[in-house]
Swiss-Prot record:
Residues 27-199 form the BPL/LPL catalytic domain. One of its GO terms (biological process) is protein modification process. The keyword Cytoplasm applies. GO terms for cellular component: cytoplasm. In the reaction, the free carboxyl group of octanoic acid is attached via an amide linkage to the epsilon-amino group of a specific lysine residue of lipoyl domains of lipoate-dependent enzymes. It catalyses: octanoyl-[ACP] + L-lysyl-[protein] = N(6)-octanoyl-L-lysyl-[protein] + holo-[ACP] + H(+). It comes from Legionella pneumophila (strain Lens). Signal peptide: none annotated. This is Octanoyltransferase.
């Protein structure tokens, strides 16, 4: 597993790089984890419906090829893209999603933030509020896209959409529990727990 810390990047640029990486990889290619933040952007998943974008204002909307509905990415949100040959690892996509949810819950528990999952609504929640989203694409047995964890960001752009297709879905973030939390530190803990699941 190769880990890349990419800083803050344009969504479309990284999406193209993920597709290119996945298209040229072979059975000997290492799996990779890309850690980054994005400039403000709304992304529609393959199941995304236009009516879930309520008021985008000046924020760009990108029609993506990941699973799921519309979400928002912006600075202060930890994005981790999982470029993994799940066929080689004998993993199903549902098992991978469940493992990613476990990793996110472990990170949150490290900070004593009580997190949970919800049946039929992938991602991680604190009470009824969503704190992390998951959206993946599988091509030729290999995944790309991944997770987004709200760390210390401006949540107001989520008000311009129905997050993940749920009307009035409230969002939360780690800084509500730890005001001085740093994304870099959270990223390190994410990698630590990720590598306990995936060598």
């Amino acid at each position: 597993m190769i880990i890349h810390n990419l800083g803050i990047k344009d969504y479309t640029e990284i999406w193209e790089q993920m597709k290119e990486f996945t298209a040229v990889r072979d059975s000997n290619s290492y799996d990779e984890l890309w850690l980054l933040e994005h400039y403000p952007v709304y992304t529609q998943g393959q199941a995304g419906k236009p009516e879930h974008v309520l008021n985008p204002n000046s924020i760009k909307i990108v029609q993506s090829d990941r699973g799921g509905q519309v979400t928002y990415h912006g600075p202060g949100q930890l994005v981790a893209y999982v470029l993994m040959d799940i066929r080689r690892r004998n993993l199903g996509i549902r098992t991978l999603v469940a493992k990613l949810e476990e990793i996110l819950i472990s990170v949150l528990e490290h900070y004593r933030i009580p997190a949970n999952i919800r049946s039929g609504a992938p991602g991680v929640y604190v009470g009824e509020k969503k704190i992390a989203s998951i959206g993946l694409r599988v091509k030729n047995g290999c995944t790309y896209h991944g997770i987004a964890l709200n760390v210390n960001m401006d949540l107001s752009p989520f008000l311009g959409i129905n997050p993940c297709g749920f009307a009035k879905m409230e969002m939360t973030q780690m800084s509500h529990f730890h005001p001085n939390i740093q994304l870099e530190e959270v990223s390190q803990h994410f990698v630590q727990y990720f590598l306990t699941q995936f060598k």
